[in-house]
């Protein structure tokens, strides 16, 4: 019995509020910051001449040696993405250099772990501790490589977190 009376009372209050409602204009403003104004320099790795038989995923490891500068950024917490043509070597996504069974593995220099490449892979970082990257030639297990010149490239994208 009490439940029915309470429900009826709430219903009556709702109708009173609804009868006295007044439309109000709501103004929403959104400010979207542009991407941070960053520049990247010194981002070229030249392996020079390597011996095909010595390519094992750790020989010929080189520092990617880039410098990232974002002087007019609005925040210190950024994120990085590497984009480019990739291939899969021994189950890992690496930079495609145009040779079958051959690629360049991008690594976190701190622990030589694979650095994720691709449009869905963002790595958060603070401008004071930027990711250090290595590049190392890799070949598919059992691949027979021929001598040739190879090259590959990546695009570094930096944005706010």
Explain the meaning of each model-derived region.
Residues 2, 14-161:
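Mature extracellular/passenger domains of Gram-negative fimbrial/pilin and adhesin proteins
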Residues 1-9:
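Sec-dependent signal peptide recognition
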């Amino acid at each position: 019995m009490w439940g029915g009376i309470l429900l009826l009372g709430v219903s009556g209050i709702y109708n009173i509020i609804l009868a006295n409602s007044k439309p109000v204009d709501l103004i929403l403003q959104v400010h979207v910051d542009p991407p941070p104004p960053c520049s990247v320099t010194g981002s070229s790795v030249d392996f020079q001449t390597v011996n095909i038989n010595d390519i094992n995923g750790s020989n010929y490891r080189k520092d990617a040696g880039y410098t990232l500068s974002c002087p007019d950024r609005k925040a210190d917490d950024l994120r990085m993405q590497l984009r480019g043509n990739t291939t899969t070597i021994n189950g890992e996504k690496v930079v495609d250099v145009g040779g079958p069974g051959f690629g360049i593995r991008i690594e976190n220099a701190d622990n030589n772990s694979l650095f994720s490449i691709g449009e869905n892979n963002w790595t958060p970082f603070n401008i004071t501790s930027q990711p250090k990257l290595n590049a190392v030639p890799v070949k598919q297990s059992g691949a027979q490589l021929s001598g040739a010149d190879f090259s590959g490239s990546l695009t570094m994208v930096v944005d706010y977190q």
